[in-house]
């Protein structure tokens, strides 16, 4: 039986390279993983006062994470770190206090950015280890660079052999990591 993986992408751009990379991951993922993108672009900015109200977008995202066996966070690099959109989703799912739905779910990290920098995933590791998140984090990540230098073609297909290899290695290792839980 395959593991259900909630994929949270920290970009809602219609031309998001992160979405294109996830589409590629979905096409190459081992049968042991079922990658499901959880849309977070419509989430209102987290506000603890809203925890007492019915916010359909909060409920939808929380339920999707709750129903998953594992999680992958995918982010562009914004000013040397992860995106505000991803951070907002992390906050929404980790609240109300004491009711975090992240706890114990094996986490994979990926970033698609201009340089291939690991800075966003390094910062996310710290968050994932926090008391309200407490996720086992894969000891590797997928960092894909060259997005403005031909990694993707005009049809949105990943054509960089290096990036393809990075993502293939990541998803195979992540499947092995998730199988331990």
Give the residues covered by each predicted segment.
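A generic structural motif
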Residues: 30-36, 133-135
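N-terminal beta1-alpha1 ligand-phosphate binding loop
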Residues: 2-32
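N-terminal beta-loop-helix "entrance" segment that forms/cooperates
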Residues: 40-56, 151
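Short beta-strand/turn micro-motifs composed of small residues
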Residues: 9, 39, 111
